[in-house]
Swiss-Prot record:
Residues 29-49 have a biased composition (Low complexity). Residues 1-59 form a transit peptide. Keywords: Chloroplast, Nucleus, Plastid, Transit peptide. This is Protein CHLOROPLAST IMPORT APPARATUS 2. Residues 56-65 have a biased composition (Basic residues). Residues 383-425 form the CCT domain. Disruption phenotype: Pale phenotype. Defective in the general chloroplast protein import pathway. InterPro entries: CCT_domain, CONSTANS-like_ZF. Residues 21-66, 412-435 are annotated as: Disordered. The gene is CIA2. Responsible for specific up-regulation of the translocon genes TOC33 and TOC75 in leaves. Involved in the general chloroplast protein import pathway regulation, including protein import and protein translation efficiencies.
Length: 435
């Protein structure tokens, strides 16, 4: 298709250009084209070509629910064909054709990039799934080799730690629960008394080869023995330094008698009082026999003798006070409230009787009348004074009201009252002599 344009000036010049119609690709493979729904929505209506200009937003790609799973299955079947079968991938290739260009390098058979997914060559073999896992062991569960040397003050030097291939992981609590805490913590046994090497053994911890395996406490002992300060002359030459050996349990309980015990009689107050009473009785018997009382110390010092005598006297006084308290406690069979009748009589002896003389002589039976005459407030008649004061106040109030009324009445009578045209004065006398 060609077109020609000419300029209208003096020097005629012609410009020509050619337009070629580009055939558009099929609509299934295009991702940026849109179909016009109305003539007003697009500038060019003919077009599914990539050169078409559109104002609408392109549709975003959405995956189907099983598309991600199928892509992962195809990826795994390509990377590991011996483990994952490719049946699912062949069925789903038609469904994932629109998005296959994203995973093209990974799904290609001749691409070298698939080697990146295989870090180990043994994964290609199907026997890899049936190999047992290799158990790594720490150095606290390994066996040790000890070499005795006579020259060292340490006496034993640990050469190396060997990692054993097998470890009995059976439950200690299920097998050795009858042996107590020794089955868990182990027992410390002195293997060589001259070298001072100790071994910590746990019953039941035996390898399949027949050798007793070291437990954690034994490894801790060995690690502490490696310390040069513990082996030096300044150290304490303990298998576990820093007081850790005292935390281990001994072989047996034969040294339990060395533990400090507390006598129960020293704590109990009743037994202590009985002891003091018995001691006092023995002191009295010795005094009656004429013997000297000696508690502790030498007899030669006179000062000590004086101190002893004072101690005995204090013991005697304490015993007497205890006896008195016991007697009083035995006498108090009822309630602990005790009325001091003598003290009450002495307190009221100086005061006069609350009953007046008239009632004292009369032998009336009316108790209420007698109680009415009792002066409860005998201190200068406080209640009577208050009653009199109230009465006077009330009387003066009434008197003042009466006086005020009379004064008002008098003033009203003195004022002239007018009733119509007549004026009457109170001082004016009528002809009849009446007001």
């Amino acid at each position: 298709m060609s077109a020609c344009l000419s300029s209208g000036g003096g020097g005629a010049a012609a410009y020509s250009f050619e337009l070629e119609k580009v055939k558009s690709p099929p609509p299934s493979s295009s991702t940026t084209t849109t179909r016009a729904t109305s003539p007003s929505s697009t500038i060019s209506e003919s077009s599914n070509s990539p050169l078409a200009i559109s104002t609408r937003k392109p549709r975003t790609q959405r995956k189907r629910p099983n598309q991600t799973y199928n892509e992962a299955a195809t990826l795994l079947s390509t990377a590991y064909p011996n483990i994952f079968s490719s049946n699912l991938s062949s069925k789903q290739k038609t469904h994932s054709s629109s998005n296959s260009h994203f995973y093209g390098p990974l799904l290609s058979d001749n691409d070298d990039a698939s080697d990146l997914l295989l870090p180990y060559e043994s994964i290609e073999e199907p026997d890899f799934l049936f190999h047992p896992t290799i158990q790594t062991k720490t150095e606290f569960f390994s066996d040790q080799k000890e070499v005795n040397s006579g020259g060292d003050c340490y006496g034993g030097e640990i050469e190396k730690f060997d990692f054993s291939d097998e470890f009995d992981a059976e439950s200690i609590l299920d097998e050795d629960i009858e042996e107590g805490i020794d089955s868990i913590m182990g027992t410390v046994v002195e293997s060589n008394s001259n070298s001072g090497i100790y071994e910590s053994r746990v019953p039941g911890m035996i390898n399949r080869g027949g050798r007793s395996s070291s437990n954690r406490i034994g490894k801790l002992e060995q690690m502490m023995m490696i310390n040069s300060w513990n082996r030096s002359s300044n150290g304490f030459n303990f298998p576990l330094g820093l007081g850790l050996r005292s935390a281990l349990r001994e072989n047996d309980d034969t040294k339990l008698w060395k533990i400090h015990t507390v006598d129960f009689e020293q704590i109990s107050p009743r037994i202590q009082t009985v002891k003091t009473e018995t001691a006092i009785s023995t002191v009295d018997e010795e005094k009656s026999d004429g013997k000297k009382v000696v508690i502790s110390g030498e007899k030669s010092n006179k000062k000590k003798k004086k101190k002893k005598m004072t101690v005995t006297t204090t013991l005697i006084t304490e015993s007497k006070s205890l006896e008195d308290t016991e007697e009083t406690s035995l006498k108090r069979t009822g309630p602990l409230l005790k009325l001091d009748y003598d003290g009450v009589l002495e307190a009221w002896s100086d005061k006069t009787s609350p009953f007046p003389d008239e009632i004292q002589g009369s032998e009336a039976v009316d108790v209420n009348a007698r109680l009415a005459q009792i002066d409860l407030f005998g201190d200068s008649g406080m209640r009577e004074a208050s009653v009199l004061r109230y009465k006077e106040k009330r009387r003066t109030r009434l008197f003042s009201k009466k006086i005020r009324y009379q004064v008002r009445k008098l003033n009203a009578d003195q004022r002239p009252r007018m009733k119509g045209r007549f004026v009457r004065r109170p001082n004016e006398s009528t002809p009849s002599g009446q007001r």
